[in-house]
Amino acid sequence: MPSRPQTVFRAKVATTTVDLREAPFRRDRATWTRPDDYTGCQHFGVAAREAGIGAVRYESVRDPLHGGCHAVLSPRAFARPAPIEQQTWMLSVSRDRVVWQRTHALKPEEHEFPASLWTRPS
């Protein structure tokens, strides 16, 4: 697959947030961390929106280090009308590898992952 540009951004969020990594939600960790079934997360997202929650913190399912992620559920969650920072990254996907590349004169970056992190287990 040819490289495709992706815009990533950093923004300030000011809203009611729940963290699935903390009690009482952590007891259902198996529901939130299934790489092949998002049903539990989708049901939680619907309930969170209905309860007026603006964002959800959770652990990455595919990051081997289980880094934190932030899902914004409403545009009202953003504290400012514009992002603090934007970057353009090139995404390349092959059968075996996923590569993110950022070409920047002062700070070029590249992150490469095995595609198996995104495939369903057999």
Model-derived regions, located:
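Active-site and NAD+-binding cores of ADP-ribose-processing enzymes
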Residues: M1-S122
